């Protein structure tokens, strides 16, 4: 069994409010989850509107 964990730190200078950030984060999370079949969530910096931190995790039962 293999476990993969990744943290993505993104700077989004065009976002000027938490509402705008929420729209960007929801879109990114949906695309990541649908395309790669992994677990993903916003993990840090939730109150800072120009920084997005996304944690991604996957578990594989056997090596591909």
Functional labels for PLM-detected ranges:
Residues 1-14, 23, 28-64:
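N-terminal intrinsically disordered, cationic/polar leader segments
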Residues 20:
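A contiguous binding-surface segment within folded domains or other stable secondary-structure elements
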